[in-house]
Amino acid sequence: VVFSFGEITFSRSRWTNGFETRIPVDEWLGLEKYKRYSIEFLYHVAKLATMMPYRQVCKVIDSTLQTIITKDCVLKAVKFVEKLLKEKERYRFYLEEPPERKKVKKLYVEGDGVMIKSTDSREERRYLDLTHFVIHTGSKKVSTKRYELQDKHEILQLNYDKAKYNLLDYIYNNYEVDDDTILITNSDMGKGYTSRVFKELGKALKVKKHEHFWDIYHVKEKLSSYLRKYPIELTDFASDAVKKYNSDKLELVFDTVESLICDELEDQEFQKFKKKVLNNFKYIKPAHLRNLSNRGIGIMESQHRKITYRMKRRGMYWSKWGISTMANMIILERANGLRELFFGSWRKVYSEYKEGSFSAGRLFKKTDELD
């Protein structure tokens, strides 16, 4: 059996009372039936898999434990995590006591998608969109130059509708929203993350005050990208207009651009772009003009980084289940929750519940047969 300290061969005795057979050594060591890898070892493999490619994990295990494993072993650890994630979700739904709802003055929600290369997607579209929502209650200074998000929780799903459901479910079960609560949302206004989506969230939560922001990084990026074929001064003027929240100045920039356009198709594209920017200009309004701090707003790109760093380098391709499982593993590891998933007390409670439900199922089946 391979443990976290190396590979060991040993023999043990089975104990029986005539009705039940048990192996105390296996139980004490936490070994599962027919498995040659300990749970502790699988935990370490899964942890390493969140940081590096599967083949690299094999090399690290070989150099540290002098134990040779294949990438299939790493895959087995990841699939074991997938199984635990599903069990934890069922455990939460059926058994776990609902947490005490926290009363907050400000609740921050941001959403965006991450495009991941997939082996399961259609030939003409080799990317899958991973939905990512982040919920937190503000930003706190923890050192001279570092701030930390408070009560951060991340939701990652390939199914957009399920992600939205999980978002609302998490907020409803963990936060007490009243008339004094301010819902602060931020997005790039892309498909699935428009102001309307977050307004629906606010309506479902029955908040009295909701402030939505069009992520300033994406606004400047869009303006810079669109205006780069025109004189550089126009890009500077547009950036200044956004910074000072001056719609008149921005309209002046657009009027100048319009006068430089000669092609009809280009004009149609420009009118579409101009309409989107001006119609949503109110969401560009800076936080200080809304009597809010900008701390904790616009954090999505930094939250994406841990996912993209592991899953988008060197042209990696992922299966559907692999995208979802690895993304959630990374989130758990960064939040120091991966070990709790493997060894938390919930596993024993869930195991007892599962055994009880199976016993009840067999009893009902036997009763039906007798009837």
Task: Report each predicted region and the residues it spans.
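Structured, non-catalytic alpha/beta "coupling" segments that mediate domain-domain communication
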Residues: 1-18
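Catalytic center-proximal scaffold of phosphoryl-transfer enzymes
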Residues: 15-371
